[in-house]
Regions:
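Gram-positive cell-envelope targeting signals
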Residues: 1-19, 26, 30
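Loop/turn elements at helix/coil->beta-strand transitions in domains of secreted/extracellular proteins
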Residues: 10-13, 44-46, 84-88
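Solvent-exposed loop/turn segments at secondary-structure junctions
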Residues: 19-23, 95-99, 171-172
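Short, polar/charged alpha-helical segment
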Residues: 24-48
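Acidic, glycine-anchored loop motifs typical of Ca2+
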Residues: 40-53, 58-62
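Extracytoplasmic/periplasmic substrate-recognition and gating elements
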Residues: 55-71, 79-89, 157-173
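Extracytoplasmic "Venus flytrap"/periplasmic binding protein-like
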Residues: 66-135
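Periplasmic solute-binding protein
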Residues: 120-173
């Protein structure tokens, strides 16, 4: 009961979907840097941004993909998308593959494809590059160091500059 009562519930959830996890330093810096741009949506008196990681490789021809990690990532992502999950912001390594497999994104103008089951929507009109947003590109995210997930170190901004931002669509029946 204690864990349920005192559990921190995020106000904003961001889903990172890529072939490998982001470095812990980058995730922490991103959560901290986004917090001032968010509000206390759940009314608990705190603003909490949470970045959830989904390790998924949408390239079926990639033979170096670990089947167990792939299955776990796909299962978790599918559960989040199908259960009416709380994630609406996506940080994507492969936006084309993500949209083709999930059909979950809305267009940049806020409209959604006519049929969410149709995955031939133009994904380029549904995302923007991290570097195309001055606010995101200007965040002070510092550097990441090697850890259990990442073998190298470098600039978190440089790492994120290769990703795209997309927003989950909301369809009405």
């Amino acid at each position: 009961i204690k864990d349920t009562v005192f559990q921190t519930r995020p106000d904003v959830q961001v889903a990172y979907v890529g072939t490998s996890d982001l470095p812990t330093d980058t995730v922490t810096a991103l959560q901290d840097a986004l917090t001032p741009f968010c509000s206390d949506l759940n009314g608990d008196g705190r603003v909490v941004v949470q970045v959830d990681s989904y390790t998924v490789d949408f390239d079926a021809a990639n033979e170096s993909t670990d089947a167990y990690y792939q299955m776990a990532g796909v299962t978790r992502l599918s559960a989040e998308l199908s259960s009416g999950g709380k994630t609406y912001i996506f940080l994507l390594e492969d936006p084309e593959g993500f949209e083709a497999q999930t059909g979950a994104l809305q267009y940049l103008d806020g409209t959604v494809p006519d049929d969410p089951e149709t995955t031939d929507a133009d994904w380029r009109e549904m995302v923007y590059r991290w570097t195309d947003c001055p606010v995101l590109a200007g965040l002070d995210l510092g550097d990441y160091t090697s850890d259990a997930v990442q073998n190298d170190s470098g600039s978190s901004q440089e790492l994120l500059s290769h990703y795209y931002i997309g927003i989950r669509g909301a369809w009405t029946k």
